[in-house]
Amino acid sequence: MITIVLLILAYLLGSIPSGLWIGQVFFQINLREHGSGNTGTTNTFRILGKKAGMATFVIDFFKGTLATLLPIIFHLQGVSPLIFGLLAVIGHTFPIFAGFKGGKAVATSAGVIFGFAPIFCLYLAIIFFGALYLGSMISLSSVTASIAAVIGVLLFPLFGFILSNYDSLFIAIILALASLIIIRHKDNIARIKNKTENLVPWGLNLTHQDPKK
């Protein structure tokens, strides 16, 4: 019974639409009607500012981490923490508190990985910010980090680097999360190909573009 309750709790944690609620409560703004229309960290930064964007990222990240740690906190045996983390990502992507229309799962997925394999998460953060510095595109950085996650989870155990051994469930979860993130960024990928993607004012390309509808 406790397992079912915690699994539901993991989904509900993921379902917290932090950007949407921050916009509505503190700014009287519906993020879905502004910028890209997304309720995640990037659009929150653009529309509501740095403080709101950072708050959104922190909440989205740590709701993934907390969900992953639930079975450890409650000394639950028999179910991998990754299953709880995956449910949080599903909740973030299809939140019951926001009409099942959620974000692109980047921050929450990172939080899940941090809760299970923090050094691997650090590796992905380096890849993410390296790609962001080179391309000035959050979407490109997210997709690049997703691909790097797949490469890392498959190759690192061969050399005992960062990951000491193969974990079939961790590999499956990484493949699932990477696929989800890439699919959720399909429109961004099209804009990258067309050279019309939104840029952030940081890195080698400091050009700023208005968010596209």
UniProtKB/Swiss-Prot annotation:
The keyword Lipid metabolism applies. Optimum pH is 7.4. Keywords: Cell membrane, Lipid biosynthesis, Lipid metabolism, Membrane, Phospholipid biosynthesis, Phospholipid metabolism, Transferase, Transmembrane, Transmembrane helix. It is a multi-pass membrane protein. It holds the Pfam family G3P_acyltransf. GO terms for molecular function: acyl-phosphate glycerol-3-phosphate acyltransferase activity. Inhibited by acyl-CoA and 1-acylglycerol-3-phosphate. One of its GO terms (cellular component) is plasma membrane. It is found in: Cell membrane. Catalyzes the transfer of an acyl group from acyl-phosphate (acyl-PO(4)) to glycerol-3-phosphate (G3P) to form lysophosphatidic acid (LPA). This enzyme utilizes acyl-phosphate as fatty acyl donor, but not acyl-CoA or acyl-ACP. This is Glycerol-3-phosphate acyltransferase.
